[in-house]
């Protein structure tokens, strides 16, 4: 399950006011608490869509209320588990984390939420469509629960406006490693530790943090899990740097 996001160095230095804080995201679409690493709703849904089950829907929904899906292919809102069943096993799926600095082609509708799930069906048709479908699921707040708004990504020519790229684990690991080095370099340049002495402890805790295994689907490949955790640590470093309005 790839996680696509813009270059983290730019996130650290250029877009503090336009990027939502961790507390703002939590208020807008709060679904769970995790042991250590923060798995956003879109990341959890992308992990569980290939193995649709009541357990997966429950993990995504958390304890704050049922989730529904607002899909133009259906009438009204559909319970998340029912939509997952109708959608069937996807051919490709990716959590995307667009930012104003790097919105990702075709995914502008996810900018406000800062996250979404890009899904491509496996076959030529499904219960929701008579043809191969590519769509974007964008999380939105709805009282104490959540709604996933489906945005079709198929253009008039029949081609997807945004396609899920093939997953290359080796390339992804190299990208995460390079981005981590950039993030640490940016933190050093910003010299945040001088004004925030607790930062070193926060970073130490984050570097050793792991994902709550109860939130992950069974059978998740160990190397993919490790890559996911490295990506989440990188994301967490960027969020720590952005917590202080004056830091960047």
Predicted regions and their residues:
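Terminal low-complexity, poorly structured segments
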Residues: 8, 18, 199-202
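Extreme N-terminal basic, low-complexity initiation segments
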Residues: 1-12
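Hydrophobic, Leu/Ile/Phe/Ala-enriched alpha-helical segments that form helix-helix packing faces
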Residues: 84-87, 183, 187, 238
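Internal, hydrophobic cores of structured domains that mediate oligomerization or house catalytic pockets
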Residues: 90-186
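Alpha-helical oligomerization segments
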Residues: 189-248
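N-terminal intrinsically disordered, low-complexity regulatory tails that precede a folded domain
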Residues: 5, 17, 22-127
């Amino acid at each position: 399950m790839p996680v696509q996001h813009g270059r983290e160095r730019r996130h650290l230095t250029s877009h503090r006011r336009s990027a939502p804080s961790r507390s703002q995201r939590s208020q807008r679409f709060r679904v769970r608490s995790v042991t250590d690493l923060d798995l956003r709703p879109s990341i959890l849904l992308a992990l569980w869509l290939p193995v649709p089950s009541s357990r997966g829907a429950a993990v995504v929904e958390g304890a704050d209320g049922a989730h529904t899906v607002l899909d133009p292919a259906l009438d009204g809102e559909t319970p998340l588990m029912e939509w997952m069943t109708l959608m069937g096993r996807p051919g490709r799926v990716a959590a995307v984390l667009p930012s104003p600095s790097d919105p990702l082609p075709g995914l502008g509708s996810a900018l406000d939420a800062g996250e979404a799930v890009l899904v491509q069906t496996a076959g030529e048709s499904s219960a929701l469509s008579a043809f191969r479908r590519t769509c974007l699921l964008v999380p939105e707040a709805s009282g104490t629960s959540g709604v996933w708004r489906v945005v079709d990504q198929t253009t008039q020519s029949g081609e997807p406006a945004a396609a899920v790229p093939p997953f290359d684990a080796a390339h992804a690991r190299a990208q995460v490693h390079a981005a981590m080095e950039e993030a640490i370099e940016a933190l050093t340049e910003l010299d945040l530790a001088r004004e925030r002495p607790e930062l070193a402890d926060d970073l130490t805790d984050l570097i050793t943090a792991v994902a709550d295994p109860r939130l992950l689907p069974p059978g998740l490949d160990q190397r993919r899990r490790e890559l996911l955790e490295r990506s989440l640590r990188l994301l967490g470093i960027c969020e720590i740097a952005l917590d202080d309005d004056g830091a960047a």
